[in-house]
Amino acid sequence: MAERTHACGKVTVEAVGQTVQLKGWVQKRRDLGGLIFIDLRDRTGIVQVVFNPETSKEALEVAETIRSEYVLHVEGTVVERGEGAINDNMATGRIEVQATKVNVLNAAKTTPIIIADDTDASEDVRLKYRYLDLRRPVMFNTFKMRHDVTKTIRNFLDTEEFLEVETPILTKSTPEGARDYLVPSRVHDGEFYALPQSPQLFKQLLMVGGFERYYQVARCFRDEDLRADRQPEFTQIDIEASFLTQDEILDMMERMMTKVMKDAKGVEVSAPFPRMKYADAMARYGSDKPDTRFEMELTDLSEFAAGCGFKVFTSAVESGGQVKAINAKGAASKYSRKDIDALTEFVKVYGAKGLAWLKVEEDGLKGPIAKFFGEEDANVLMNTLEATAGDLLLFVADKKSVVADSLGALRLRLGKELELIDESKFNFLWVTDWPLLEYDEDADRYFAAHHPFTMPFREDVELLETAPEKARAQAYDLVLNGYELGGGSLRIYERDVQEKMFKALGFSQEEAQEQFGFLLEAFEYGTPPHGGIALGLDRLVMLLAGRTNLRDTIAFPKTASASCLLTEAPSPVAEAQLEELNLKLNVKEEK
């Protein structure tokens, strides 16, 4: 078999007159009265191959048997297309290949999906036949971008003198957040490894070990409820460094991301990125990962609401809640009563009891609650919300968390429906100064907002024992277009501070020692100040490639129920395998 001389998408007018050897898949076959045209495809693109009896009867006879997705080896001569046959939408659109020989390397059944960017297959079919789905150019281009992003990051970190170090996949189960995936040990009867949710503890131990600068393209595993932007196994760019301040870490990440954007996407973004404190993000956008490509910020009306004539507002404030609103500029005529009812049902998903609304008309406020506001109150509302005729005002009165969640989500929905978002923009944002701990009323305990190893502000360390809810974290999230790209922090590196953190999280001294004794002991041997960040590679590629689902950036992803339709994993195992592990199943019968 002759060697391939050209990739299909790389045959251009410079090759006219040359004999070429091409190998690829049949994208399309057209029989035009004695001539057969085939679009031959490989990962670089498509080239048109012509089978003409005057050139080779033998090749034409073979071409008559060929169907879509056959794998071919074609030998032929490159010629220029006629003036009326030029296709400037293709890189190879000015030439075609006159076939002299063709060899069928492999035949193909009719595929269950159309191998094209626009396919009619459902996602389940695409996942079941993922190897066919991956043939679509849009999928290859996504993974080419993933490769380019990863290569750029590796090259950048190499110039910054970071070492790539692999950390264990089989590790210890620790209560860090989501449920662990557990792996039974055959050698240690009744004991289990856990797959890592992140390399957090190991990268900190590498800092104890004096490596100073570490990174890893790390596989991580979390047994959690899935959604469009979550997978049970995912990849993060894991970075840790000693002796750097928060500003130095953020500056380095900005330089890395601007290089990624330029090299992988061809987009120039300016640094430094804007910074916003967590409290401000929640107050202004109702989100800890705000999409700043459009305005429509939340306005706090609690002070006004406390003295207005609308009881729903006043009672919310009196009970410790708040009232906030968003002004959808010029949207009054675009939303009917039925449309607003749909918005009301939407905010109820986020815990809101309802959605109050007003439309601003030339002669004043109109809507179900307009009668509760006199002229003076109406003017205050209009001025506070900077409202003018044609605006739609939307209000939620509830607990602070419910107000933020519901209006934050509503803001994003309206931004999309009103086409306020410039999809060509890439708006990076740092969200800083996070709360260190969050209180869970159901569990009646505090949980770490990021993880238990986050360093509090120095002046807040004592608050861990007196007022944990007031302690602030030296933590930072990188946000892009309303998506959390990654999170990081400066880390605790002193045993006494780490023990205070564990105590605030409800660990007894014995539990902390049992779970994290190795880390606490390490902190007694001269641990350097350190910090880092973990960036979600899958999510970054999703945003840069313009995809809407993480599954499109992972070669062989899982479904929303964490199953693989291709291999049918998870699956039962043989009884002998269970016996070898001394395991017995207690499977609940379906009712």
From Swiss-Prot:
ATP binds at residues 222-224, 231, 484, 536-539. GO terms for cellular component: cytoplasm. It is found in: Cytoplasm. Residues 200-203 are annotated as: Aspartate. One of its GO terms (biological process) is aspartyl-tRNA aminoacylation. InterPro entries: Aa-tRNA-synt_II, aa-tRNA-synth_II, aa-tRNA-synth_II/BPL/LPL, Asp-tRNA-ligase_1, Asp-tRNA-ligase_1_N, Asp/Asn-tRNA-synth_IIb, AspRS_core, GAD-like_sf. It holds the Pfam family tRNA_anti-codon. PANTHER family: ASPARTATE--TRNA LIGASE, MITOCHONDRIAL (PTHR22594:SF5), ASPARTYL/LYSYL-TRNA SYNTHETASE (PTHR22594). Aspartyl-tRNA synthetase with relaxed tRNA specificity since it is able to aspartylate not only its cognate tRNA(Asp) but also tRNA(Asn). Reaction proceeds in two steps: L-aspartate is first activated by ATP to form Asp-AMP and then transferred to the acceptor end of tRNA(Asp/Asn). This is Aspartate--tRNA(Asp/Asn) ligase. The gene is aspS.
